[in-house]
Amino acid sequence: MQVDPVVYQLQRAVSQDPIAVKDAEGHLNNWKKEPGFFGKLYSIFLDKQNDMSLRWIAIIQLRNSIDIIWRKNTKMSLLPEERDFIRCNALLGSIKSENLLSIQNALVVSRIARLDYPTEWPSLFHDLLGKLQQSLGTGDYDVALRLLITLHHIIKAMAGNRLLRSRQIFYKLAPELLTILQPILHSSLSSWMMILESSKEIKDSTLLSYMQISRYTLKACRRLVVFGFQNPSESEFSERMLAFCAVHQRKLLSMLGTMLQSSRSPIVVGECLEMAFAHAFLFNKPFFDFSFYSPCLTKFPATIDYISLHYDFLGQISSHLSSYKEKFEESSKNFEKLVIMSLRVFILVIQEFCNTKSSHPETAQVLYNSFLVDNRINNLLDLLITKLLILKEEDFEEWTDSPQQWVLEQSTQDVEFNVRPCAEKLLKCFFDAYGDIIVSPFKDMIYSVFECPKTLTQAVQQDTLISSFGVGYTQLKSIFPFAKWLQEAAVPNMASINDIGISRVYRRRIAIFLSQWIEDSSSEQLLEVIYKLYCSFLNLTDPCNDAVVILTTIDAFKTVLDDWNFSENSFLSIKENLFVHVLSLFKAFESVDARTSILSLLGTLLARAGEHVAPMESTIASLLSQLWDGWKKEPLLRARVLAVMHQFVNAIKAKSFEFSTFLYTVIEYCVNPESPEHVIFEADAMELWSTFLMYIQKLPETFTLLIPHLLYHLSQATSTLPFVLMIVSSYQLLDNTVLMKDYSFTIFEKLNDLLDDVKNETLQALCKTVCLLIETTPMDMIYESLLNSSLLSRLLLSIATNDKHPQVLIEYLLVVSRISLREPELILKVCQTKNINIAMLIGNWILLNDHINHSKDRKLNTLALSSLLRTNHPDVLAVLDSIMNLWFSVLSEVEEDANGDATIYYKNDDYSAVGFYLDETSEEMTRRKQLLLKDPVHSVNSRSFFISVFMFCRDANGGMENFQNQYLSTVNPALLEQFQSML
């Protein structure tokens, strides 16, 4: 029997032969443009006689293409009969398929529904809900579950629509769906909760069916109440749903808490227990969604219920928090997530009433008071400090077994995945909202942190107390004697603690605490003590400094060094020891996160030390070279090394010339377009390259070898283009022949090609670079290149035809003005060669002067136009009247000194390199200042220049009489009279 070719290729696509798989994928991709192919795929999926793997690959192929093929007027659009076939059998595909296949079919149906409902598929929900109610009525829970999964994915897809018409359709649909789904949700929830409340050991498979049905119904309802109403805060459906979830959340959490408290084995195990936890998380999802998408918790009465039920839950399990991992070994992470979920509820409520107390003062006050009922806030504080913030046995196990991973988990700012950071966040919220109430209990605990811990238990308790004082810095700084504690407790205690375990706990907490209180440490004496402590914590030879202490210190010390209270003198006094300790850390840690942290601290040390890095330059450069060579398989670390190299060059400035060979090797690898990783490193390497050129006094020979790579990147209109232009400028300022002697034509052509690809600031940077090249290069070296390249003719043609926005033409005009000042004949020669109308060019040139914003650029433009008069070209002399008007405009606007300079001629970006900041102490700044002194705008006296041009034109035209007859007769007599007074 002949095998269908599509079936054959699908069978090959799921085979174990990689060659067959690749060949089959090629055939399947080619067939996607053939009419009827996707209809064939769906019929293969629907045929239950086919192998499951075959049906799986068929529906996956359809799912991956549905977004493209279902849109009309595309090359892969479906035939109308294919669309009808898929729509007619879509629900059948969910009903008759196994659960895994049904989910994939649901994804296909959801994407079709998003586009076709209600215009092309008006009966979708009528048919789906009818079959759903029928299956529930007959007790066919497997079919009901598959239909609910399909409905959930349809609602999820439609809820993500952002088009106004689609949103309005969804708003109209949501109440109708909720009316049908809410009874199903209530019935299924009640059924399985009654079974659980019976407290008998449960083995009934029906329980799982009820739980699965309620889970997907709850998912669908959640999307509907959150996204199905334009203003959820004003919807009765949303309010009722949140209240419904609160009631059932209380029941479920109470059951789970009772299981934890009970000495018996849990009555629910395996998949049913996982499903119970899933419901506990889902009941809270609408609460979190309302807070995130449409902040309105203050308007819902059920918010008070959520506070109450989660407070009761935490109170119920507080004494068993240390035993849940043994009790629910396989679901311990889920129990931890429940605790985090409860803490997050409190965090969101506090944040919302803080944000809405001005807009909704009454309801915000109700929420505020809810934490004061039954001494809740003090009980929660006690729970945080004695149960959740305290280090536990499993913490010390992970501290020993996986120190780097443990530090990463503890330092994370993501409160959704770790109990301790979440508890710290809640404590911070309590301090912010109830600071005046909770400060008082902390007064009684102040001197507890002065005591020296004698045992590990005492150290752990003190760790929690100090952590609390760190979190509440803003509210506690007025009552906590930080300086006294540091000098009379912290430093002496560390010296007197002999137990390594106690010392490690104490040092870790001190490192964190100092970074939290650094703002209160403005005195030189305190900062010196703090810096010395951090330096001692980074010493690998001290047995008390294990991986946890060192990694915690690295992150904390970076925060301290970044603070505005930084003391240079105190830092420099321990600088050498710091660098020695930090440089020795790279061999001690292997994880990417740890090495990244060390590199980050090294970069901060370099930035703070600056030129005081000496005499460590060679040692640091050698280490960076070793790291670069040793981490060839770690691109993320190499990228960080590049950033530190940049900070290193910034620190040692001109001395970086000594390491030019090493820097050349790194930069060449990173910017070479043939390098396999140049895309990853290109931007960082460009920044390093430009910074190095900024500080050196002369160009290293090796860096001339990078010019071909520079020219390649000059032709790429990517995000690195500003750096490329900056590097071109730096090369030119270092040696005005190294680029232009051999590459001037190529450079001008590449710059011309970029004109259409760049806009706004990048266009200004490009034109500024061209101006620099023209100013600094001998004209005989670039004359032919300017004449023959497309750049100058392109600029002149745009000005003559006025084909760009005036601000773009101004940038072009400034480039042309630089050329005209140096070689006016070249302008006319290009016009003649390229058939550009000179009269139109000069006319538009003069008109554009009104669009020039800065007086410096107006003077440059006028000097350039005046230079054109020296060509004695009739078309230029014909507009002498307009040019003389510009003369008097310049002369009346600014009062110049004898050299032609004036304060107003200086611009903010005169010393910037293509818009980038330039270090005032850099060699490039010196070079730019010297160039600026030679700029005609600052060195040519306008009055003298205009007079000399006038005299030249008079003499070139046979004296005053002939000049008068030919050209001056068209000039306004008042202008001539005014000019005569200048002579």
Curated annotation (Swiss-Prot):
Residue ranges of the TM segments: none
Importin N-terminal domain residues: 24-96
Localization: Nucleus
Cellular component aspect of the GO annotation: cytosol; nuclear envelope; nuclear periphery; nucleus
Main location: nucleus
GO molecular function, a single term: nuclear import signal receptor activity
Keywords noted in UniProt: mRNA transport, Nucleus, Transport
A biological process term (GO) from this entry: protein import into nucleus
InterPro entries, per database record: ARM-like (IPR011989), ARM-type_fold (IPR016024), Exportin-1/Importin-b-like (IPR013598), Importin-beta_N (IPR001494)
Family to which the UniProt record says this protein belongs: Belongs to the importin beta family.
Function as written in the Swiss-Prot or TrEMBL entry: Functions as a component of the nuclear pore complex (NPC). NPC components, collectively referred to as nucleoporins (NUPs), can play the role of both NPC structural components and of docking or interaction partners for transiently associated nuclear transport factors. Active directional transport is assured by both, a Phe-Gly (FG) repeat affinity gradient for these transport factors across the NPC and a transport cofactor concentration gradient across the nuclear envelope. Involved in the export of mRNA from the nucleus to the cytoplasm.
Name the UniProt record assigns to this protein: Importin beta-like protein kap113
Species this chain originates from: Schizosaccharomyces pombe (strain 972 / ATCC 24843)
